[in-house]
Structure formats: structure tokens, C-alpha cells
Swiss-Prot record:
Pathway: Amino-acid biosynthesis; L-proline biosynthesis; L-glutamate 5-semialdehyde from L-glutamate: step 2/2. Its EC number is 1.2.1.41. It is an enzyme of class 1 (oxidoreductase). It is found in: Cytoplasm. One of its GO terms (cellular component) is cytoplasm. The keyword Amino-acid biosynthesis applies. This is Gamma-glutamyl phosphate reductase. The gene is proA.
Length: 417
């Protein structure tokens, strides 16, 4: 099955690579229209997925990611239309020169070819990834979480109908709808057809891909994000940022999971934090130093377990640790962070600059929420993933991250001397 999918995707990629920006946008507009026109089919399939997932004990955070509503589906269709408005990087001349030989040399952006994406139970990812791949002239093979099998099958069928109505092969967007995990291992060895693999999921999936894949892999999406509260912070303003970073949408990878508090401000900061977290329904997981002060406050508080510093809660839970100074905070982030998103709250710009320079994450913030790490917020449009590695992309992966480049030399029967 996967062999045939690979062949179809590779053949489709050749045709997609030749499309103009106008032709690609026409396809995307058709997809957006069809998602709305056939919304009942997709929503019915999703309702079955959600019912099964709930019966199987899936947590509320994951159920929230899985569920579609008419409003959410319309938002997904609107996101596809937004991709139409983004500048197409394909064909862009990055740089060029004329060599001493007279050869005109240029470096031009081109599609990668076929992208493979393994991702969690999030139906919007199916459409986001497909639209970005099509915009950049790439074919894509999708393998979503088993909880979304019906939703993904219905959504991809709608996308394929739109492709065919525009004269393009259905192989441009395909989904593996068999939940058999053995197919993931098979997919990891499809280097004959897939040019880049993006796993979005937990540490176990990332480890599997790194160890077994014969395809270049870009990992990301695991966000053990930190906020360091410096001693010079403005407490009221800091609390606004922390509430946003923790509670706006706890199930996302850019949500803060650990709060590091400078010991010199702990006495005044922790009571205010407890009050705010109680109002927000957040459970605090505190180290010994913080626990002594937080136990008298209104927020629910428990003693932190050592392993929780490495946890991505994806829920209304927040680690709180007292640190000696900026050096201590940076050391903690280096040991427990996932190089996703980390922030400092401070009025001391020297400390801010040190934090920016010394914290080696894909996104580092000064006096701002970690929730900004998002393709839409960065002006990139929908994102394929948030890469936490350094090659070939880092941070939110928009259109440019789905391209590579080729060198083109134009001569006049020019030969090398």
C-alpha cells in the first residue's frame, strides 16, 4: 500500500513543481470552498471519532484538539484562503552573480518534492499541512493519530476531489488511514519517495524516527517552555503574561510549563501568583522553597516531582521553582528545556540580553508570552510544525521551510578553463 502511495506522490510532485502561483492559489481556493460545501460529511466523521475517543478514555486536552465544530471548520477553510495571500517562495532568486568565466549563476528556491508528516490527533493539521505543501509545490503523505482516522479520511477525500476538479492528481495529498503502527516504521524507510519527514508528537515518536528513519527528519513540537521571573520585574504586568502563557490554551506546545522565580522577589511575587493561579484554576507544582510560601495561599499546590520538570503537562498545571539568579535559571533551562520557547520577565535589559544570548531555544522572548511561537502570529501563515532543531529549519515552519534551492548556471557555450 505505502509503495503505491509513494509512487503516486512522487509523480504528483513533478506536476506540482511546474504550477504557477496563480494555479496553486486556484487549487487552494477550491479546497477552501469544498471544505465548507462538504462540512457536514467532515463533521459527522469527526463526531464519530470524538465519541470513540471519549469512550476509550482520551483526556480532555486531547479531546479539545480532536473536536471540530462548524466554527472551527470554517476557521480552517479561512486559514487555507490566508495561505493564498502569502507570497510564494518557489522560484525566488536568493542570490546570484556573474563568474569570471562569464557564467551567470543564481540560487533559486524550489520545492522539496514529497513531504511525509506524522502527527497527533488534530484535524486542523491535516488541512494546514496540505495547504502549505501545495502552495510550495510539494506532494504530501499524511499519517495522523489513530483517533482521527475518520476525520482525516473525510477531509483528504474532499481535498482530493478539489485537486481532481483542477486537473491535478489525487496523489498530491494522501493519508495513511490504517492505524497499524507497523506502517509508521515502513513509512520511515521510504527514502526512495519521501524527501523530508516531519514527526509531530511525543518523545517516543521522535526517538523512533531518529533511530529508524532513512529519510531526513525534522523534529519538534515538544514544548517544555519556561518563564524566568527576574528580581526587577513588574509583578502585575508579569502576572498578565504568565496567565496568558499558561491558560489561554493549555493543550498547545507553546504553553509555559515551568516558572522560575528569582529568590529576591519570591516573598512579594508568590502570594500574588497564588491568587492569580487560583482564579485561573491552575494547580502549582512547587519545589520545597516555593511550597513553604504557596501552601498558605488560595491556589491548589502540590510538591513537585523531579521528573515533572521534564513534563509537557498540556493542562492547567504549572511547575514553580525558586532560583538563585539568572545563571541558575539558565542552567535549569539547559537541563530540562526542549529548545522550543522560553521567556524572561524583567526591567533589567542587561539580564534580558544575557538571557537572549545564552538560552539556545528556537524562540526566546523578553517580557512577552511564549504563546507567540506560532506560524500565524509570526506572519508565516499556517505552520507545518515548530522545529526545535537547527537543520534545516528552526521555530515555526512556514512556506520557506518547505523549499530547498538549486544552483542554475547560464552560459554561452561556456567551458571551464
Amino acid at each position: 500500500m505505502l509503495e503505491q502511495m509513494g509512487i503516486a506522490a512522487k509523480q504528483a510532485s513533478y506536476k506540482l513543481a511546474q504550477l504557477s502561483s496563480r494555479e496553486k492559489n486556484r487549487v487552494l481556493e477550491k479546497i477552501a470552498d469544498e471544505l465548507e460545501a462538504q462540512s457536514e460529511i467532515i463533521l459527522n466523521a469527526n463526531a464519530q471519532d470524538v465519541a470513540d475517543a471519549r469512550a476509550n478514555g482520551l483526556g480532555e486536552a486531547m479531546l479539545d484538539r480532536l473536536a471540530l465544530t462548524p466554527a472551527r471548520l470554517k476557521g480552517i477553510a479561512d486559514d487555507v484562503r490566508q495561505v493564498c495571500n502569502l507570497a510564494d517562495p518557489v522560484g525566488q532568486v536568493i542570490d546570484g552573480s556573474v563568474l569570471d568565466s562569464g557564467l551567470r549563476l543564481e540560487r533559486r528556491r524550489v520545492p522539496l518534492g514529497v513531504i511525509g508528516v506524522i502527527y497527533e490527533a488534530r484535524p486542523n493539521v491535516t488541512v494546514d499541512v496540505a495547504s502549505l505543501c501545495l502552495k510550495t509545490g510539494n506532494a504530501v503523505i499524511l499519517r495522523g493519530g489513530k483517533e482521527t482516522c475518520r476525520t482525516n479520511a473525510a477531509t483528504v477525500a474532499v481535498i482530493q476531489d478539489a485537486l481532481k476538479s483542477c486537473g491535478l492528481p489525487a496523489g498530491a495529498v494522501q493519508a495513511i488511514d490504517n492505524p497499524d503502527r507497523a506502517l509508521v516504521s515502513e513509512m520511515l524507510r521510504m527514502d526512495k519517495y519521501i524527501d523530508m519527514l516531519i514527526p509531530r508528537g511525543g518523545a517516543g515518536l521522535h526517538k523512533l524516527c531518529r533511530e529508524q528513519s532513512t529519510i531526513p527528519v525534522i523534529t519538534g513540537g515538544i514544548g517544555v517552555c519556561h518563564i524566568y521571573v527576574d528580581e526587577s520585574v513588574e509583578i502585575a504586568e508579569a502576572l498578565k503574561v504568565i496567565v496568558n502563557a499558561k491558560t489561554q490554551r493549555p493543550s498547545t506546545c507553546n504553553t509555559v510549563e515551568t516558572l522560575l522565580v528569582n529568590k529576591n522577589i519570591a516573598d512579594s511575587f508568590l502570594p500574588a501568583l497564588s491568587k492569580q493561579m487560583a482564579e485561573s484554576g491552575v494547580t502549582l507544582h512547587a519545589d520545597a522553597a516555593a511550597l513553604a510560601q504557596l501552601q498558605t495561599g488560595p491556589a491548589k499546590v502540590v510538591a513537585v516531582k523531579a521528573e515533572e520538570y521534564d513534563d509537557e503537562f498540556l493542562s492547567l498545571d504549572l511547575n514553580v521553582k525558586i532560583v538563585s539568579d539568572l545563571d541558575d535559571a539558565i542552567a535549569h533551562i539547559r537541563e530540562h528545556g526542549t529548545e522550543h520557547s522560553d521567556a524572561i520577565l524583567t526591567r533589567d535589559m542587561r539580564n534580558a540580553q544575557r538571557f537572549v544570548n545564552e538560552v539556545d531555544s528556537s524562540a526566546v522572548y523578553v517580557n512577552a508570552s511564549t504563546r507567540f511561537t506560532d506560524g500565524g502570529q509570526f506572519g508565516l501563515g499556517a505552520e507545518v510544525a515548530v522545529s526545535t532543531q537547527k537543520l534545516h529549519a528552526r521555530g515555526p515552519m512556514g512556506l520557506e521551510a518547505l523549499t530547498t534551492y538549486k544552483w542554475i548556471g547560464i552560459g554561452d557555450y561556456t567551458i571551464r578553463a
